[in-house]
Amino acid sequence: MFWDKIKDAFSSEKSVDYNKENKVVKSRFTMLVKGCKDEGSILLVGDVYGTVKKEDVTVLFKDGKVSHLKVAKLIDSTGNDCESVTDAYAKIGFENIDKGEDFKYALITNIDFQIESDVNKAVENPYILGLLYEYDNNYNDEDFINLFFREMVMSHYLLPVRMSEDFKGSGSTVLKKDTKIDIYGIELQGGINALPVFTDWTALKNWSDKGPANWKMETIIESFPDIVGFLKGEGGFIINPYGPQSFYMNSESISSIVNSPGYQSQFGDAKIETKVAKGGEKIFLGYPPDNEEVAAIKKRLVAFGNAHSEINLIDMMLRVDETGTKSYLVITDIDDSDVRKYYKDIYNSCRDLLREVVYLDFATLEQADFAKNMMKQPPLYRKN
């Protein structure tokens, strides 16, 4: 059924995906690491949901790090070496694994990790999906709960809708002023209405298959703050209402998360503080490693430079202070005496990507004289 409210979309840009039922990979799997055993080599243990084989996989760590490894060894619950494990306990060994990593609550998966939504790819949220499978077993663990809600608010979801205007294809589009978006709702036990959102097309298909024949499935991709905005303080939402694993958030729980310090630091008003370097302070400075987080931030910085003609240069380095705290140092050359307003805008444009490294530092090109000896490569962005 439809909810009794309709959202106006006044010239807003939406990531729209219509009838894009991407091929379901039958061997999709997640495994949340429960422990680590050294049996001549490091083996990660946990319950597999789906089918894991000796293949290339992604390991998502709770500190935001992402590794791409190859499964070299699979041991089933009886202790036998095997080629695959389906929906069962397993021990997994990898080629070239770093024994010094903290593997607690790391997620092993062959589902694509997406640090940001991409309308040209099927939406995937493997970490929150894997955490959903294990919620009932770990909800009393504070570390698990903190990780669970962090991933919930940082994920992007498929929201099924019906629009008053017909569209073709998929991608990012600017909706016309009078476009109406009808939001679907489902009724839970006790007569509670909830907004259904989905982690991926596999979960959405479980619901769409229950719809009428020839039903035109229209979806938009929304972040957690977007979903909260749709609710406007009323009611709750349910993730994957028809499986593979569901989770309901009522309005009280949503309010508790939105008002938490962690959420406000991630999505609230950005605060820029002036830092004065201490005399004799030792820092490490170099180029950040090539990974999904760094690549996505670089892309945003280049786009920001292209959108502001007064910006002459943007570069990005990795800074590590004496305590081991990491930050990305964004170096700018701007034809404006009030550079702080740009810092805030740059931070807001990149903050949702900060997972492994959660801080951004800023310096003008003049202030960054200390970094010139390290800046061996062409700048990330230079105005033509």
Regions found by a protein language model. Name each.
Residues 2-18, 111-384:
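An interfacial alpha-helical scaffold signature
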Residues 17-115:
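Beta-strand/loop-dominated core regions that host nucleotide or nucleotide-derived cofactor-binding catalytic loops
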